[in-house]
Amino acid sequence: MKIKCPSGALHEVEYAKSCPDCHGAVPKPILHSLLLGRDRVRTPKEKPAYGVGSLVDECLRRSFYRITEEEILDLEKLWTFSRGHAIHEFITRTLPKTEKEIFIKKEFQSFDVIGFIDAMSEDTVYEFKTTNNIPDAPQSHHALQAQGYFSMLAPEQQAKINKIKVIYLSLQKIKSFEVPRRDILPMLEARAAQLTLSLSKKTPPKREVGWICKYCEFYDFCFNRDKGFD
């Protein structure tokens, strides 16, 4: 991972901790908290493991780039991530450990699919999303992410779940949406297989053009450097 400095330079995490320009933008105590753990190195695995969120992303090519390209984050984005994490912790702090941050894993021959359920209390699976603007309806990939977690539960666990809810949290309000219970495991498997094939061939999957393109951090790679792969 590289940190994009306010000066425009790209820094290693350790250097960013003492960078004068980074310190000028974010006070030292906050900066060090933002950078904590950001220099972790990925450990090689025998077979790839994909998060549910990466498989239900609007564009599988973006998920491919997130694996193959070095991650670059600016301080504003780091603050957004950290704020979201803090809100998640606040919401779930009174839940028993067995009802929050529940790790799930589905093994396939060539890959695994993994995820963390934000909360699963009584008969409901909850997925929390922090946002500046609360939508009028749940975004499709957020609904799919929650449904994906439900799909990966053991049959006896699924039988106990009557509701799946996506909860949007802004600094001003909270809004809850219920999404249908449905099994999307075949979709997750197909997307993971496609991503595995693309990674093995070192060729990006087909571009999935949509509204997200103009906000994508990999726009230049996708539409310029790799346009020959369309």
List the predicted regions and their residue ranges.
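A broad detector of the eukaryotic-type serine/threonine protein kinase catalytic domain
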Residues: 130-133, 200
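Acidic active-site catalytic centers that drive phospho-/nucleotidyl reactions
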Residues: 118, 127, 145
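Metal-dependent nuclease catalytic regions and adjoining charged, substrate-binding loops involved
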Residues: 2-27, 109-112, 138-139, 152-230
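A residue-level signal for conserved active-site and pocket-lining positions in enzyme catalytic cores
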Residues: 59, 149, 216
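Metal-dependent nuclease catalytic cores that hydrolyze phosphodiester bonds in DNA/RNA
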Residues: 1-124, 132-134, 138-140
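Generic alpha-helical hydrophobic packing signal
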Residues: 101-105, 146, 162-163
